[in-house]
Amino acid sequence: MKQFENKVAVITGAASGFGKAFAAYGATLGMKLVLADIQQDALDATVSELKSRGTEVIGVRTDVSLAREVQTLADITMSTFGTVNLLFNNAGVGAGGFVWENTEKDWEWVLGVNLNSVIHGVRIFTPLMLDAAARDAAYEAHIVNTASMSGLVNAPTMGVYNVSKHAVVSLSETLYHDLGLVTDQVHCSVLCPYFVPTGFNQSRRNRPASLANAQTPTRSQQVAQAMSDKAVTSARISADEIAQQTYQAMREGDFYIYSHPEAMDPVKQRFEQLLARCNPGDPFAGHPELRRNLARTVRG
């Protein structure tokens, strides 16, 4: 996709972090925006901010883990703008700790937001895009699914999150191949960011009460949260920079989008180990002190 002016973008997780940055940058390109988020006050504030700049934008409170609410999001988009050109499946949450200590509710919450939301978005919006492409040879569309570097490597104490993001990478790669069989007008990308100061580490603020854990967090869960807090808050690349990279990747037709190319060594190491049938290597190999500190801390 080369031109973005007057195109319609649907963005989930749009009230903060990457989603808000996608919206803000899209607004500078003259796009029409449909913003979805579960946090109503933050969503309203983002919509108001963009409207004050002259952007044509609406907000739709959406629990993206629920198919019926994503369907409502699509219905409102079509009734308001009549089309959709960009879909950012971006909403995401996290829960850490040893995989045997994660509860059923941890899995339900993280997979619901991180994976099921992408499934719902692809299943509901892709047919709308393909139908528009069949009716108009000039129509263009693009889907961006936000995964993570955790969709390419498996760090300890991040099992639930790792599983969800590996699944998003797999879904996105399959979507790429499937679209290639039927159209030249609808494309997709997968964004694999490293740590970025987005407030993602505080995603538990939007965890539904029905999926809250009754028990006190375990030591490994507390350590994982502390590591996430430190990594996110100390990150140097901003969400705004990632948004610009993402739009540029769409212009160039890139599928894989990496926020930190210098962090790809563990990915290369992992695939070399797979090919050599080696046991999994240390994802912290470049920073051995991290593994030592983690082991010492979780053991108490």
Indicate where each model-derived feature is located:
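Canonical Rossmann dinucleotide-binding motif of NAD(H)/NADP(H)-dependent dehydrogenases/reductases
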Residues: K2-V34
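Conserved glycine-rich Rossmann-like NAD(P)H-binding loop of the short-chain dehydrogenase/reductase
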Residues: L29-A45
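The beta1-alpha1 cofactor-binding region of Rossmann-like NAD(H)/NADP(H)-dependent oxidoreductases
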Residues: Q40-D41, V60-T72, E104
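Substrate-binding pocket helix/loop in short-chain dehydrogenase/reductase
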Residues: F98-V99, T103-L111
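Active-site helix of classical SDR
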Residues: V122, S164
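Residue(s) in the substrate-gating loop at a strand-loop-helix junction
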Residues: S148
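SDR active-site lid
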Residues: L181-H260
